[in-house]
């Protein structure tokens, strides 16, 4: 019987209205089923500027007192994703372009989220992770040892990070929409090398034989796909240090991971992601990215490239420098990327993993005086550690090394993004607790095959900590691999705090240089209470750790957790993906294996809680995993201190800014040459009379613009200080001078459109009396071939 005849029959027998009602109900239920099947999660992405003070503030990472911020390479961001079950649990993961997470930052972000959303987001389901750039402003951690070189706490650094994290989460929350998640992984072979191979070799040979490399080469990526807009972002985890930029760099930079994120997001924007319409075509994406070069941002309203003619050069010469002028504060925010989009923006984060002993300086370590390789065991040159440096792929150009390592991560992430096909499915879950790592009891195996109970120790740093690493050597006569110490430096140490016998024995064979865990004046020097957290999104499990795990330490932790999750009657199968998110929620320096600790290179000397620190982490994460399997909560008996009110900051504020008589802020000091034409790859620069960037951070704004003359003789912004090609450099003629200069340096991209351009500077000056005043000024115009 045909369907039409059957329907007529049913209508005669039971009444047509009743049949149509049932059919309509069936269609609705079928449609709901399809929607639920297609949208297992709600997914939201967000990002916000956290660049911070671009002047006067010591940079966090190298502990070099002379590394003071004086401009911007490109901006720092907080990037967040939220994944939620439509009627269940949700998790937030935030990746910040900062050296590490900070306990006090995490505390204050959670307070703000509670005030805004109640109990929806809390310490259990929110993770905040740092990429470990060594080129961001410091002073945002609360423990003394991490803010000594920044002259204490820097409120501006702290506030901009807290604000930016909150705003990125708010944006992600507001963007929550039905979507899917895919996971993919693959090896990236040329973005990291082991900087402490002698310590790695002390791990058991049987264990080392299981791995092809002495660093982790695997990148794990998750791809977020909105049901209507298509791909909206990606996060990946890969281990390599943020030390492509050196200890002498003074420009704020996200280093290689920040660069990779910038490249990935620019590539996505070139492709028009997220799409305005549903169902992005993967074939279109593949064909597009195969032809793309290093991504850049350029305004979409710029016309087709102009052919350079004499008339165009003459046109450029008719536009002289504008001279400085006052601005309303709202006029300074002229980002190339519009924040007023009618669709979510594409967000891509390159997260950190077990990078403790992984360097991006892949060419090896060499003595700067002889060009010979450094000593293998101690990383010294004729006994001096300060002469041994690692070399990046762009050596001697640190910017090129940063670009190359960032681009390699971007290209691998792009390939994984494009080929991701394994869909993440399953419930969302999380476990979190705080532990006192200064006295944690740990059961460890003995050589006889039994078990014994040992303890972790109050925090302490060894002599080799002061030797630094091949990414950033220390000073004086310290060296890596020192298990004895030096009588002179022990005398100096004792002026601060003499470690007791129990502390010395607990940390053995580490010779203690700084007994930070027992130093309490003016407040705690090092943390004792630390968070451990495990997040589950389907078959993806993220281990959130507050420190830098070495390669083998991270492998042991991942394997231990995976063994627990896949044993017995667990709902997890062998296809589980376990990633380690380093430098998350708080910071406690390094975690080595027991065997690596014995060698006392930099990483071992910086393992704060003694030789059994890793065993403690493994034990406690196994407990989290067992609790997750059993669907049990994890008790929390400790809380980290909130020491914000105790913070001491000794960095002086800006007193006032000035210019020479007859000169305005924004006037040009050194202009682009008149009647000039520049080729692709050449560099254009102009210097302006400026003021201290600390007067206004121009958050989500810009200090620098490249503008292009369009066909209607309007100046249109095409590059800003978040672009790879444009650098903002700030300087004073003397340390205590009230005068300052801003140099805008633009390297013309190879794919820049030919035409007429100029440079524009934005800033804010502080008078002796009154409020901050914003200003701008432009260079004379020039032609680009």
From Swiss-Prot:
GO BP, one annotated term: sphingosine biosynthetic process
Signal peptide region: 1-35
Repressor among keywords: no
A Pfam family: Ceramidse_alk_C
Active-site annotation: 359 (nucleophile)
Key word Hydrolase present: yes
GO CC terms of this entry: endoplasmic reticulum; extracellular region; Golgi apparatus; membrane
GO molecular function term, any single one: N-acylsphingosine amidohydrolase activity
Glycosylation sites: 31, 377, 675, 685
Enzyme class: hydrolase
Function: Hydrolyzes the sphingolipid ceramide into sphingosine and free fatty acid. Uses ceramide instead of phytoceramide as substrate.
Family: Belongs to the neutral ceramidase family.
Listed name of the protein: Neutral ceramidase
């Amino acid at each position: 019987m045909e369907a039409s005849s059957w329907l007529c029959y049913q209508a005669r027998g039971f009444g047509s209205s009743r049949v149509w009602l049932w059919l309509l109900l069936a269609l609705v239920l079928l449609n709901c089923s399809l929607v639920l099947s297609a949208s297992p999660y709600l997914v939201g992405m967000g990002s916000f500027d956290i660049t911070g003070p671009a002047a006067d503030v010591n940079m966090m990472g190298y502990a070099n007192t002379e590394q003071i911020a004086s401009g911007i390479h490109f901006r720092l961001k907080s990037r967040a994703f939220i994944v939620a079950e439509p009627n269940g649990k949700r998790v937030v993961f935030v990746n910040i372009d900062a050296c590490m997470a900070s306990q006090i930052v995490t505390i204050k972000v959670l307070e703000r989220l509670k005030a805004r959303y109640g109990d929806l987001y809390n310490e259990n389901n929110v993770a905040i992770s740092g990429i470990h750039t060594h080129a961001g402003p410091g002073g945002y951690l609360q423990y003394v040892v991490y803010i000594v070189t920044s002259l204490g706490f820097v409120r501006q650094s702290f506030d901009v990070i807290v604000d930016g994290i909150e705003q990125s989460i708010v944006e992600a929350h507001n963007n929550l929409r039905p979507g899917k998640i895919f996971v993919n992984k693959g090896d990236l072979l040329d973005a990291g090398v082991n900087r402490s191979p002698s310590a790695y070799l002390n791990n058991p040979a049987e264990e080392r034989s299981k791995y092809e490399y002495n660093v982790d080469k695997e990148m794990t990526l998750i791809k977020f796909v909105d049901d209507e807009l298509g791909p909206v972002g990606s996060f990946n985890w890969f281990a390599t240090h943020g030390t492509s930029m050196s200890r002498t760099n003074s420009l704020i930079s996200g280093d290689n991971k920040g660069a990779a994120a910038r490249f990935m997001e620019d590539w996505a924007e070139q492709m028009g992601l997220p799409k305005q319409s549903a169902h992005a075509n993967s074939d279109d994406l593949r064909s597009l990215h195969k032809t793309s070069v290093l991504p850049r941002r350029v305004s979409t309203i710029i016309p087709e490239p102009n052919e350079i003619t004499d008339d165009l050069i003459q046109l450029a010469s008719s536009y002289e420098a504008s001279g400085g002028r006052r601005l309303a504060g709202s006029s300074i925010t002229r980002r190339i990327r519009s924040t007023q989009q009618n669709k979510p923006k594409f967000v891509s984060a390159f997260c950190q993993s077990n990078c403790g002993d992984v360097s991006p300086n892949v060419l090896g370590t060499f003595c700067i005086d002889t060009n010979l390789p450094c000593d293998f065991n101690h990383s010294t040159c004729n006994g001096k550690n300060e002469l041994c440096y690692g070399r990046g792929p762009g050596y001697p150009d640190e910017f090129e090394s940063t670009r190359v390592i960032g681009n390699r991560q971007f290209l691998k992430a792009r390939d994984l993004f494009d080929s991701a096909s394994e869909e993440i499915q399953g419930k969302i879950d999380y476990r979190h607790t705080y532990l006192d790592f200064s006295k944690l009891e740990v059961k460890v195996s003995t050589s006889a095959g039994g078990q014994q109970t040992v303890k972790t120790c109050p925090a302490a740093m060894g002599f080799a900590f002061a030797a630094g690493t091949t990414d950033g050597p220390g000073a004086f006569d310290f060296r890596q691999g020192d298990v004895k110490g030096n009588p002179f430096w022990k005398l100096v140490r004792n002026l601060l705090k003499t470690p007791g016998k129990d502390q010395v024995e607990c940390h053995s064979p580490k010779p203690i240089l700084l007994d930070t865990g027992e130093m309490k004046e003016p407040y705690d020097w090092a943390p004792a209470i630390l968070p451990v957290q495990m997040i589950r999104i389907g078959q993806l499990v993220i281990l959130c750790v507050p420190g830098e795990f070495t390669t083998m330490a991270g492998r042991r932790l991942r394997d231990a957790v995976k063994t627990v999750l896949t044993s017995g009657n667990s709902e997890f199968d062998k296809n589980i993906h376990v990633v380690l998110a380093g430098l998350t929620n708080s910071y406690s320096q390094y975690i080595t294996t027991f065997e690596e600790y014995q060698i006392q290179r930099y990483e071992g000397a910086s393992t704060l809680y003694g030789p059994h620190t890793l065993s403690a982490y493994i034990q406690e994460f196994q407990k989290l995993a067992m609790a997750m399997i059993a669907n049990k909560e994890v008790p929390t008996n400790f809380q980290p201190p909130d020491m914000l009110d105790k913070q001491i900051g000794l960095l002086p504020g800006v007193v006032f800014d000035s210019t020479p008589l007859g000169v305005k802020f924004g006037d040009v000091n050194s202009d682009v040459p008149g009647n000039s034409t520049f080729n692709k790859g050449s560099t254009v620069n102009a210097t302006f009379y400026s003021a201290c960037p600390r007067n206004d951070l121009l958050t989500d704004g810009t200090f620098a613009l490249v503008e292009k003359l369009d066909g209607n003789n309007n100046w249109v912004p095409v590059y800003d200080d978040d672009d790879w090609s444009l650098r903002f450099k700030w300087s004073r003629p003397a340390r205590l001078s009230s005068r300052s200069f801003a140099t805008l340096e633009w390297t013309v991209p190879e794919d820049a459109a030919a035409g007429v351009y100029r440079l524009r500077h934005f800033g804010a000056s502080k008078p002796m009396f009154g409020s901050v005043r914003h200003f701008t000024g432009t260079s004379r115009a020039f032609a680009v071939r």
